[in-house]
Amino acid sequence: MTKKTQVGLIFGGNSSEYEVSIVSCRNIYKAIDKEKFDVHPIWITNEGYFANEEESFKVLEDPSYQVKNPHKVHNISNLIELENLPEIDVFFPIVHGNLGEDGVLQGLFRLMNKPFVGDDVLAAAVTMDKEFTKILAQRVGVPVADWITIKRFEYDDKNNDKLDYEKVAEKLGRDMFVKPSNQGSSVGVSHVTNADEYAAALKEAFKYDDKVLVEETVPGTEVETAVLGNDKPIVAGVGQITNAKGSFYSYKNKYDDNSTSKLQIPADLPQEIIDTVRRNARKVYEVTECSGMARIDSMLTPGGKVVLTEVNALPGFTNISMYPKLFEEAGVPYTELITRLIEVGMERFDHKKTLLHKHD
């Protein structure tokens, strides 16, 4: 009998996307091939405590469950020696947002010398930062929305011109989006059209980050595609998101079962547009050095221009998430998708073991 691969499914975390992580983890646990994998859920509470496996299963059944015997991690050895933690063959992190998809957790796996699913340290960190993603996308000719960046010290200087809506509007137009540079799932994002909304949006965004992006609004339809793999990635088809008039693809619309946003897979678009979305996705995936997986989001303008909005290195796996739905449409069902994600993570690890880390 073939020995099953032991998978450590890490979820939760001290993140604004804590609840999304639990839903994604539950779906992955239900869908994973139990004949190939033994799954060990590892719950990180919102306070940053590690729970044992028994309690981790309980919170998957009831997200409101509170940990009874938390194990506070003070250093790496604490994590490695977590009580009742089996010998894990590969980690599958599904911790969304800060500390989960920004390279921090990935760096920990590297220190532990363990394979893991999803992007490596550099790609996770770069794609979490919306400004760096834009800069790299421009390098390979992928259009992005015009923007300015406001740092915390600039926000604290109340005389800074970047806080003046009218002056910013001269560059970006009066219709803008304000968003934390290092957040996902549209957390802290606001749509503004006047000075009062702009001031309130900056205040909200700086609750989540020390760097905030102010972008011109790109009119049109939101389109997304999904990418899987390492050196020779597979780009799925394209999905289209239709939002209710006057709304955008907000946190609520992304994860609420009563969302007013409608997902259309495959997108009903000309083949030329489909090809551009997929081609741009591959360029951005490669220039940001992604591996494993990513969801690439863009806006399609009425004039047919495809403008990159975001690279999500750890896309959602909820019931309404675009990433698994796009691959299902491409002929890769949920269970097979999870298997392939684990396989490409282990392949990357095996390759890195062949590299020299010291000079003889």
Swiss-Prot record:
Top-rank lineage group of the source organism: Bacteria
Enzyme class: ligase
Residue positions binding Mg(2+) 1: 297, 310
GO molecular function per UniProt: ATP binding; D-alanine-D-alanine ligase activity; metal ion binding
Pathway(s) served: Cell wall biogenesis; peptidoglycan biosynthesis
Cell location: Cytoplasm
Cofactor, how bound (note): Binds 2 magnesium or manganese ions per subunit.
Names of required cofactors: Mg(2+); Mn(2+)
Catalytic activity: 2 D-alanine + ATP = D-alanyl-D-alanine + ADP + phosphate + H(+)
EC number: 6.3.2.4
GO CC entries: cytosol
UniProt keyword list: ATP-binding, Cell shape, Cell wall biogenesis/degradation, Cytoplasm, Ligase, Magnesium, Manganese, Metal-binding, Nucleotide-binding, Peptidoglycan synthesis
Residues at which ATP binds: 169-224
Residue ranges of domain ATP-grasp in the record: 134-343
GO biological process: cell wall organization; peptidoglycan biosynthetic process; regulation of cell shape
Function: Cell wall formation.
Family designation: Belongs to the D-alanine--D-alanine ligase family.
UniProt cross-references to PANTHER family, sorted A to Z: D-ALANINE--D-ALANINE LIGASE, D-ALANINE--D-ALANINE LIGASE A
Protein name: D-alanine--D-alanine ligase
The species this protein was found in: Lactobacillus helveticus (strain DPC 4571)
Lineage: Bacteria, Bacillati, Bacillota, Bacilli, Lactobacillales
